[in-house]
């Protein structure tokens, strides 16, 4: 984008600059209480429905060899690059609903992240729920922990000053939950992280896009992930 050398320095040059993705135009929305199935097909005439089927394609690349293929069930990516990239699929408007993900994530060298990644506005916040990672340099401020989905996550906060964002060059905070026992499949109970962040004074605003993303730089690797409600 998610796109982003310290956890946050990395997530800065990467995460911050990665906020220039491509999106699929929604044609409909989804039930207020559920995420739609991943199919890139959206209807458009029900004001009582809020979330469309997965309708957002994150494809941020700055160079190198990155082969990214979204599908009707998720996405796959292979990379060999010193430059940063962030790819994945999700929703134009994020929410606190759970997200299911599953598949492979392998990093041969360099840094790689597998995360739920998104932004909010008012306040402008870039956030990660990091499920797996390889060789990221952790920096920023540790704010606390949260237990969710069978593991403990360490919560970090970082402030980015005059960096690229979904609103252009701006100053904004990053909220990052890092799972201490990494996994490549499971359910992310997003609400648990939002609640934990809020309890620590880390407040989100209006939801912007939200994706299951793979991000990498400085090496090679591959991933194949399915995404669903």
From Swiss-Prot:
Positions of the GH11 domain: 52-228
Any one GO BP annotation for this protein: xylan catabolic process
UniProt key word NADP: no
Residues with glycosylation annotation: 31
Propiece residues: 20-51
GO MF, one example: endo-1,4-beta-xylanase activity
Binding site for substrate: 117, 128, 160, 164, 174, 209
Upregulating conditions: Induced by D-xylose and L-arabinose, dependent on the cellulase and xylanase regulator xyr1. Repressed by glucose through negative regulation by the crabon catabolite repressor cre1.
Pfam families: Glyco_hydro_11 (PF00457)
Gene3D superfamilies in the record: 2.60.120.180
Signal peptide: 1-19
Keyword field contains Signal: yes
Subcellular location(s) of the protein: Secreted
Main location: secreted
Keywords per UniProt: Carbohydrate metabolism, Glycoprotein, Glycosidase, Hydrolase, Polysaccharide degradation, Secreted, Signal, Xylan degradation
pH dependence comment: Optimum pH is 3.5-4.0. Stable from pH 2.5 to 8.5 at room temperature and from pH 2.5 to 4.5 at 40 degrees Celsius.
UniProt cross-references to SUPFAM superfamilies, sorted A to Z: Concanavalin A-like lectins/glucanases (SSF49899)
Family to which the UniProt record says this protein belongs: Belongs to the glycosyl hydrolase 11 (cellulase G) family.
The protein's name in its UniProt record: Endo-1,4-beta-xylanase 1
Organism for this UniProt entry: Hypocrea jecorina (strain ATCC 56765 / BCRC 32924 / NRRL 11460 / Rut C-30) (Trichoderma reesei)
Native organism taxonomy: Eukaryota, Fungi, Dikarya, Ascomycota, Pezizomycotina
Gene name in the database record: xyn1
């Amino acid at each position: 984008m998610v796109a982003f050398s310290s956890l946050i320095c990395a997530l800065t040059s990467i995460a911050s600059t990665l906020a220039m993705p491509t999106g699929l135009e929604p044609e409909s929305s989804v039930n207020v209480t559920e995420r739609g199935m991943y199919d890139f097909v959206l209807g458009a005439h029900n004001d009582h429905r809020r979330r469309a089927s997965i309708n957002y394609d994150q494809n941020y690349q700055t160079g190198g060899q990155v082969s990214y293929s979204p599908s009707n069930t998720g996405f796959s990516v292979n990379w060999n690059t010193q430059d940063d990239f962030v790819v994945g699929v999700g929703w134009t408007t994020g929410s606190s609903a759970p997200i299911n993900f599953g598949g492979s994530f392998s990093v041969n060298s360099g840094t790689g992240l597998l995360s739920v990644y998104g932004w909010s506005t008012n306040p402008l916040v870039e956030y990660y729920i990091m499920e797996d990672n390889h060789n990221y340099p952790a920096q920023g401020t540790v704010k606390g922990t949260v237990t969710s989905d069978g593991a403990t996550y360490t919560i970090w906060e970082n402030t980015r000053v005059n960096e690229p964002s979904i609103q252009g060059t701006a100053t904004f905070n990053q909220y990052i939950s890092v799972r201490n026992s990494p996994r490549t499949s499971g359910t992310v109970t997003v609400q648990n992280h939002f609640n934990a962040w809020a309890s620590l004074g880390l407040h989100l605003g209006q939801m912007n896009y939200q994706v299951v993303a793979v991000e990498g730089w400085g090496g090679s690797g591959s991933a194949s992930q399915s995404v669903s409600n």
